[in-house]
Amino acid sequence: YCDWSSDVCSSDLDLFAHQTNVDLQNHCICFNTVKLGKSMQSIGMMTVLDQIWNRITRNRVLGRRTWIFTDEFQLLLGNSACTNYYFELSSRARKWGAILTSITQHVRSVLNNEDARRMLSDCGYIKLLNQAPDDANDIARLLHISDEEKRYIENAEVGSGLLIADKVVVPFNNTFPQDTELFHLMDTNPNRKK
């Protein structure tokens, strides 16, 4: 028998039993759960999602929009409680003045999760970069992309892909000159980092 509440409040799992060092009044807040151990991932992500919902509700009262950017979205999908919470949040966010952006490099995780598939198919704006052939086929079926459009996300060059906005599909090429300072600031390729 384990008294979960006493473990979280007074053991080595008491991470959330103290005052936060995050300034929750700031206009821009970044939550990073990457350093949480496996035993704390679930409660950490649920705490973050709860804080996000609290901010959405406060901002709604104040007449403000809330922008939420979730990077490494696939990490939420590994926990059913987090997936369910995020799905509910995404279902209500727009009506509450929030704009939700979910980012992943692992689209297969999204395609393999029914709630995530529903979130993807309900999106008003989707940006797709290069995809593996099987993933591109599944995305094309889910989002009703033609074979002609699908070729823009199969073997696509870096910076190229498809934008889908309210069912309008537009191919794009956003290649950036590599000899600029701005390119080096934005570049995420570790092989090119100095």
Protein language model regions, located:
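Conserved P-loop NTPase
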Residues: 143-193
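Short coil/turn segments at secondary-structure boundaries
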Residues: 14-22, 62, 152-156, 167
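GHKL/Histidine-kinase-like ATPase module
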Residues: 11-21, 26-28, 160-161, 171
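Short, solvent-exposed coil/turn segments
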Residues: 3, 24-26, 63, 121, ...
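Single conserved hydrophobic/aromatic residue that forms the stacking wall/gate
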Residues: 1-8
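Conserved P-loop NTPase motor cores
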Residues: 34-152, 178
